[in-house]
Amino acid sequence: QAWKYKDLDYWVDLAKLLERGYFDSLFIADVVGVYDVYRGSVETSLIDADQVPVNDPFFQVPAMATVTKHLGFGVTSALTYEQPYALARKFSTLDHLTKGRVAWNVVTSYLNSAAVNLGLKQQISHDERYDIADEFLDVTYKLWEGSWDEDAVLRDREKGIFTDPSKVHPIGHKGKYFDVPGIHLSEPSPQRTPVIFQAGASTRGRAFAAKHAEGVFISPATPEQAREVSDDIRNRAVEAGRTRDSLKIFTLLTVITAESDEAAQAKYQEYLGYSNGEGMLSFYGGWTGIDFSEYDPDQPLEAIDNDSIRSVLELLATADPHRKWTPRDIIKHRSIGGLGPVLVGGPKTVADELERWVDVGGID
């Protein structure tokens, strides 16, 4: 029923369902551009509804918060095209309205279509986007944590004082990318700083996660690869002055299960029948910057050096080192699961494999 995404009742009912099911949180992905690399057009994305049309996730959260008490809400926001002064207020507002149940999934954006529609001639380079992100978060930390003392708001009716001015401080930030001299617009929220999530497997992305994130999304192909990535991020966290257990690592897995292995495989095959191969290539075009329509469907793809999600092509190669990946292979093996592995089997098969990911891969 995802087509009902534009109706508030859809989100309210979903929140109630997740609360009843004891889910910890609802994570909402988002992009501010379109997938228009494939065939040089947005046409395929529109036909397949590849993250378009899409609404702003910030507006769903307050309604869901009113019908839940425990469910958390992870909201994606691409900071490359935001201003920290304004975005800090948005998250403070959500933190107030949810009573401290909001998280920010920090992304730097990777779609050139977003860049050109938001005033740039082309996408900012990969590493510079992370440089911007580092300073952006430094500014928001100052706004959230340093601008208002905990007891700044008095609400003193007798004296006619709502806020004690001596306890509200300009942050005086002057940096390479941002100048923010003033005070935060919002009084302290329950968390002040929302829980920070981040997803990025490049060397620069891992360093950013190690410095800032409390939750890190990764998408390795195997538990062994997960161990390498999780150990590296935790080691980097220690180098950044944090402890190894100061962040939690989550991996992308798609689980398809039924009463038996055979029934689960049948369900998987049925799901494949609903997948759209061109839609998958449209996604991969946006993720990698490669127009796969220019390649013969059976032509092996060599690693291509481009400036968009560098880890994606490496992931294809490591997912099956004996396969020379072709566009047809992407359609066949990635139409379900996207960038992550797919676990297909009965309850025991799936549970055993999930335990292996935790034990071998170091996943939380």
What is the predicted role of each segment?
Residues 127-191, 224-231, 235-358:
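An alpha-helical appendage that flanks or caps ligand/catalytic pockets
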Residues 1, 44-46, 72-77, 210-219, ...:
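Glycine- and acidic
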Residues 51-53, 80-85, 223-228, 343:
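Acidic-and-aromatic substrate-binding clefts and catalytic sites of carbohydrate-active enzymes
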Residues 26-28, 71-77, 100-106, 194-199, ...:
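Hydrophobic faces of well-ordered beta-strands that scaffold small-molecule active sites
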